[in-house]
Amino acid sequence: MAAEPDNHGLGRSRGGLTTKIRLAVDASFHVLAAVITAGQRGDAPVFERVMEKIRVPRVSVGHPRTRPKHVLADRAYSSLQIRPFLRKRGIAHTIPEKRDQAGHRIRRGAAGGRPPGFDREMYKRRHKVECRIGLLKQARGVATRYDKLAVRCQATVQLTLIRQAL
């Protein structure tokens, strides 16, 4: 059986056929990037796609900014691919370590390396993303997700974001 095309963002989940909305939000509740994926897709594999979509216009002349200064993310984004990706691009991050990763590191002893830095006060600011998703889901079209294709769901999300910005 052929794989489902990327623009068909429907995926199986506990609730049936669903899609997920991945957002990048700045400190002022502005959405920098929105990506729609199938419901069963993991968070970590989609992280780079979300980061690539970030475009912030500069006040002066020049190309838009594509690299944030700092990234806050939950445990789902704690993976061996994401931390080096952020380090290579020079982006500071606050991502809690998964419990099983910490256990493996501790079990390996000195060979396990140092734990990644984690700032609890900085992590508390992550609630802005959750609040923005809640605000986005106040729109009936986004909350009910009647759209069958990811491209239509993306359009619904974009229209809702524009309407809320006005």
Language model segments and positions:
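Active-site-proximal, Lys/Arg-enriched surface segment
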Residues: 1-25
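Structural motif
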Residues: 11, 146-153
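Short, structured patches in soluble enzyme cores that scaffold and shape functional sites
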Residues: 21, 25-27, 35-38, 97, ...
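Active-site beta-loop-alpha junctions of metal-dependent nucleic acid enzymes
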Residues: 35-61
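Helix-centered, glycine/charged polyanion-binding patches within enzymatic domains
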Residues: 40, 59-149
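Generic alpha-helical structural context detector
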Residues: 49-52, 134, 161
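Charged phosphate-binding loop/patch that engages nucleotide di/tri-phosphates or the phosphate backbone
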Residues: 156-166
